[in-house]
Amino acid sequence: MKATLSLNLPALNLTKPVMTAIAQDILAIIKIRIYKGLDYNLNKFRAYSNKPIYISYKSTTYKRLKPKGGIKRPNSMLFPGGYAEYKQKSRKRSNAIEGQTAAVDLTLSGMMLQNFVVLDSTNTKFTIGLLPPVQDYGYTVNQDRGFIGLAKKEVDQLVEIVKANLLGE
């Protein structure tokens, strides 16, 4: 999955390290927005399901975050309140990042966002995306919840950051 965006920057001769730094700024903007529970259109993420769910002890969901607080079954744990209940009861919420209060912030084990990185960079372009351990899952989540990308307001914010860092404006 590829997202392309154009930045209206002054004509500059940029180096690979500078382009990598710009890509890191974009990652930071996106991650902060995700922790606030917003997609790339700055809309709140759709709420997690309240439909009853069984988390199998052999599932990848179980491996990412061991279920806690549900009703124990022989091969699984039942959460009558759905995925929303599973997530709320099972994870240890960290509010270390200011504004990380959203119920839907795409953070379960943290593995997906830890693997959301700068994949490649040259002096003219860069690619951000997900590393192999989470690619399939992460890009599926992105199709459903749209987190990879920037809103116009964020693009404008990024342009101002780049201008300030490179031109001292």
Which residue ranges define each predicted feature?
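Short, Lys/Arg-rich flexible segments
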Residues: 1-169
